Amino acid sequence: MLANSREELVEVFDALDAELDRLDEVSFEVLTTPERLRSLERLECLVRRLPAVGHALINQLDAQASEEELGGTLCCALANRLRITKPDAARRIADAADLGPRRALTGEPLAPQLTATATAQRQGLIGEAHVKVIRALFRPPARRGGCVHPPGRRSRPGRQSRSISSRRAGPLRPAGHGLATPRRRPHRHRTRPQTRHHPEQPAIRRHVTAKWLPDPPSAGHL
C-alpha cells in the first residue's frame, strides 16, 4: 500500500466523484442487450469493491481515534456520520476487522484475517451477502441464552437427551402427556347385551319347562 499525501487523497476522491457524475449523465440507449448486461456487471463489480476501501478507514479509526474525538463509540460515530443504523454500523466494523488491513504491535502491516475473502472482495467477485455467509462459517457457535452450567450441576447425558426429545416432541403432543406415539385405532370389543336377573327367574323357568316341554323318555321306551 502506497503512502499518499492529503492532497493526493483529495484528488482521488474528487476524480471519483467527477467520473460518477459523468456516468450518471450518460444514456444507454445505444447499447444492445448483452452490452447492457455487461454494463450492469461492471457496475456491480465497482459497488462490491468500494467497501474494501472503507475497511482501512474503519480499522484506523478503531485503532487511533478516541471516544472524545468521535463523540462516543465508533459504532455511534459511524451511524451518525454515515446516516445508517447502529446494527449496520456494527456490521461494518466487524467486516473491517476480518477483511481490512491490520498492523502488528510493532507497526508491521499484516494481511487480513480472512485473506482469500478480502482479496475476492477487492476484485469485486463477492458482495455483502457472500461476505455475511463466509463470516458466519468462521464464527464460533454462540451459546443459547448465554447460560453456562456451574460445576456439579451439569445435566447427565441421558437426562439431557430426554429433555431435548421432550422439547422437540412438545408441539406434537397434548399437554400433560408423554412423548407422542402413533395413534392406534381402538379395539372394538363385541359385547353381549347384559340382562338383569329377576329374583324369581329360576322358579319361572322351572314352571315353563314343566308345562311346555315334554317329559324325558324313560328307560323302558328306549
UniProtKB/Swiss-Prot annotation:
- Bias class Basic residues marks the residues at 182-196
Query: Where is the chain membrane-spanning?
Result: none
The region called Disordered is annotated at: 142-222
Signal sequence, renumbered to the chain: none
- Spans of biased composition, class Low complexity? 160-169
Q: Name one GO cellular component term.
A: plasma membrane
Report which superkingdom the organism of origin falls in: Bacteria
What's the family?
Answer: Belongs to the Rv1128c/1148c/1588c/1702c/1945/3466 family.
Protein name per its UniProtKB record: Uncharacterized protein Rv1588c
Q: Which organism does this sequence originate in? A: Mycobacterium tuberculosis (strain ATCC 25618 / H37Rv)
Source species taxonomy = Bacteria, Bacillati, Actinomycetota, Actinomycetes, Mycobacteriales
